[in-house]
Curated annotation (Swiss-Prot):
CDD domains: Hemerythrin
Binding positions for Fe cation 2 per the UniProt entry: 60, 75, 79, 108, 113
Name of the protein this chain belongs to: Myohemerythrin
NCBIfam families in UniProt: hemeryth_dom, Hemerythrin
Any GO molecular function: oxygen carrier activity
Keywords: Iron, Metal-binding, Muscle protein, Oxygen transport, Transport
Binding residue positions for Fe cation 1: 26, 56, 60, 113
Taxonomic path: Eukaryota, Metazoa, Spiralia, Lophotrochozoa, Annelida
UniProt keyword annotation of Calcium present: no
InterPro entries cross-referenced by the UniProt entry: Haemerythrin, Haemerythrin_Fe_BS, Hemerythrin, Hemerythrin-like, Hemerythrin-like_sf, Hemerythrin_metal-bd
Length: 120
């Protein structure tokens, strides 16, 4: 399922997962992807996206593990695949890569992360 990518590319309340720390981290991910989109040749922006993503996924998976969330194995696999993808990238980023990252985050939050709302 594909969800509409907001324009401008900013986090809004429609992405709220109801855990303040994760909502803040999701906001940071939106900002990192937007920065990469605006500065496609900026290797530091891409490195920051990788770091923020890895840190967020670790926090989210820790919360899932603490509550024995049944979707953790699938969620971990999805996270691992995305991290591998963004770690393989190098600047400058092309249009397709930027579009992929924007769409992936939107779909992931609304289609995957929403499954844990109220369960962590």
């Amino acid at each position: 399922m594909s969800f509409e990518v907001p324009s401008p590319y900013v986090w809004d309340d429609s992405f709220r997962v109801a855990y303040d720390n994760l909502d803040s981290e999701h906001q940071a991910l939106f900002k990192c992807i937007a920065k990469c989109a605006e500065n496609r040749a900026d290797a530091a922006a891409l490195a920051d996206l990788v770091k923020v993503t890895v840190d967020h996924f670790a926090d989210e998976e820790r919360m899932m593990a603490k509550t024995n969330f049944s979707g953790l194995p699938e969620h971990n696999k999805i996270h691992s695949e995305f991290v591998a993808k963004i770690k393989s990238l190098s600047a400058p980023l092309d249009d397709a890569t930027v579009a992929f990252a924007k769409q992936w985050l939107v779909n992931h939050i609304k289609g995957i992360d929403f499954k844990y709302k109220g369960n962590l």
